[in-house]
Amino acid sequence: IVGLEDLSYNKIIVDAEKVGGKKVFKAKVYSSIVGYRAKLELVLKEDGLVVARIPGSPVDIPVVTLMRALGLESDKEIASAVSMVDDIQNELESSFEKTDVTTSKDAIVYISKRIAPGMLEEFQIKRAETLLDWGLLPHLGKQPENRKEKTQFLGEAVCKLLELKLGWIQPDDKDHYGNKVVKFAG
């Protein structure tokens, strides 16, 4: 019997990659429940904007907008969900500046227009809410009442990503067995 290695599920893995001569910082989570696995990827863009790549969304979604859609209304709530450390909150500044969305409802509408363009607004919003509940971190739950846990987990992932950028932590070793799952038949 041969074991198949895979990255650990439901764990935040941070990494720095060279893309076109530039360093790109990423945080990945393979959220898994029985029979379903969804990859969430957070990317720190060159201009300081943190975006999320979610299955079911053809475009990157600014993480501040995503956290607003999950129920955090104020900038202070979002910054506190990420970290209480001033240096990390300062790194979030450009993410706040580049986001025009100010309410939870506006954030859901923003996401809905990007994932289901050209459809009826009612259908767009339903699709966006389904994405938030089922496509985003399903291991934390698939109901609207699980959105608070999702914002906390997302905040933790953004914090770890910014800590990597600031040089406070090292990139996670993908080859370390602590970051892997070994699957066997049966």
Please report, for each region that a protein language model flagged, where it lies by residue:
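N-terminal non-catalytic structural scaffold regions of very large proteins
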Residues: 1-185
